Amino acid sequence: MQELVIEKKDAGQRLDKYLRKYLQNAPSSFIYRMLRKKNIVLNAGRAEGKELLCEGDTIRIFFSEETLAHFRGTEVAAKTASYTAPDIVYEDEDILLVNKPSGLLSQQDKSGEASVNDWLRDYCRNDTGTSDTFRPSVCNRLDRNTSGLVLCAKTYAGSRFLSEQIAGHELGKYYRALVEGRLEGEAVLRGLWYKDEAANRVRIEKIKDGVPDTEDTEGRYVETHYRVIASAESYSLVELRLVTGRSHQIRAHMASIGHPLAGDIKYGGHPCGKERSQLLQAFRIVFPEISGDFSRLSGKCFEIPLPPWAEKLLAVCGLETEKTGRV
């Protein structure tokens, strides 16, 4: 017999989903049969599987050691990845906010290169709050060449909270970008977003009269706000706020108005500087008013400075850092 005590990180999950992750090789039909026969019990009583787990709940599994080992699966040694570790900006028992450097993937892709997710799981591996039924994960993915703030969940409760904040478009997400051409003032950009998956390229078409086409079932509405921080003859540094959050949204939206990111070849930009030239940084995250379990984050604002290489790039482009100020 094995006894499992539910900790805070796993609270809120359905019992059957928890068991499917814990007994990863067991068919769902087998798990439900074991529940009916009381070979698996919740708080010493029969359970159906749809119960929501609470911190302190006890699950008892009446299997032999061999049966339990079979359905648990063979332990696989964790991969030790090689990466540039991101700096931690904020951490509590449920979430992490890190500063991802340019060039590091947020999540692993087909290339198998290391990512923020790899670092996160290594970082949390020896944490007493980690479990076999929840894998810490990145919640807002940034492109490889985009640097800045990435939200990560350490627990199930943290994952659910961050997912709700992102899906509800209540989280303030602000970026800095170096774009080609001279811009002045501020503007709101609205359009329909289309993605060519094969080419991994996005196009955004301006909405006629500012009203979405309800008959267009393929295009997705996107909205980007920008204001100019500093401008020179050939370049401008802008602050952008995402109302929606689609893949390549900033890159494609700025390109659609004739001001692509400097160095963003895919969207029509040209190289600027000898080393890295694409400057797109997620530099500020603002939480809305929050009550309940995560009220500690209510109204909190997290902000990071430009990396040194970006300051040098702005100087090359004729934008003095003193002009950028604290945006």
Stretches with model-predicted labels:
Residues M1-V327:
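RNA pseudouridine synthases
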